[in-house]
Amino acid sequence: MLYLTKIRNAESEFTENEQKIADFLRANVSELKSVSSRKMAKQLGISQSSIVKFAQKLGAQGFTELRMALIGEYSASREKTNATAQHLHSSITSDDSLEVIARKLNREKELALEQTCALFDYARLQKIIEVISKAPFIQITGLGGSALVGCDLSFKLMKIGYRVACEADTHVQATVSQALKKGDVQIAISYSGSKKEIVLCAEAARKQGATVIAITSLADSPLRRLAHFTLDTVSGETEWRSSSMSTRTAQNSVTDLLFVGLVQLNDVESLKMIQRSSELTQRLK
């Protein structure tokens, strides 16, 4: 019996930790080549031995055997699906009804949020919030969907008094990066962590003495290696996607948490500015 089928059939018997493992494997089956049991255990907040025991419960000798089998099953399933239906986004195909599409999209976003939140190191997050709060100037970089997340964060930070630059043009991003100073912060948003434009800006910022904070995936990447701090995001999306939907959901959960943390750090003044912003915009109606 295929392991994905075994996981589905045994779901009612899983413990809480086993259910976490099962959800992670199904949501990230396309990315398992770069996932180790150690990394997975850290992300899920469980022991490595729990992952090994889960694999053995399904009939595998260990996690490596289970991981390789799942990768093979995923590849075979994708080839079969390609022959009968057109991929529209991630696991969604042209044969799916709107009801099925809605369920798949909702579950994809739910998993992205659950797994990203499970990954947070809250002590490190608090340190990052403190670093941002003291920055004279903040630059936010990103491309495509990540740029939209960055713009949303920049608007929120400006509302509570921070000096922020978030430009869509990559040449402008690079120009701003080279002008950063010690004490300034660059928040680089890139799920892959390998986009050359974002990496170039991070290199320039670091060279100038600025602190680089990366919002990126768990995968080893040039951006992760350059960053002083990382905030990890998890998305079950595969390369078969029409837009970075669950990736953007995961990234927004991180940036929203940063914003609320900064408001909390200086709550009286922040709330005054938020109230003034609200009053001004009300006058425009």
Curated annotation (Swiss-Prot):
Pathway(s) the chain acts in: Amino-sugar metabolism; N-acetylmuramate degradation [regulation]
Residue ranges the record marks as coiled coil: none
GO molecular function: carbohydrate derivative binding; DNA binding; DNA-binding transcription factor activity
InterPro entries: Homeodomain-like_sf, HTH_RpiR, RpiR-like, RpiR-like_SIS, SIS_dom, SIS_dom_sf, Tscrpt_reg_HTH_MurR, WH-like_DNA-bd_sf
One BP annotation, GO: carbohydrate derivative metabolic process
The organism's place on the tree of life at top rank: Bacteria
Family matches, as CDD domains: SIS_RpiR
Chain's role: Represses the expression of the murPQ operon involved in the uptake and degradation of N-acetylmuramic acid (MurNAc). Binds to two adjacent inverted repeats within the operator region. MurNAc 6-phosphate, the substrate of MurQ, is the specific inducer that weakens binding of MurR to the operator.
Complex formation: Homotetramer.
NCBIfam families listed in its UniProt record: PRK15482.1
PANTHER family: GLUCOKINASE, HTH-TYPE TRANSCRIPTIONAL REGULATOR MURR
Protein name stated in the entry: HTH-type transcriptional regulator MurR
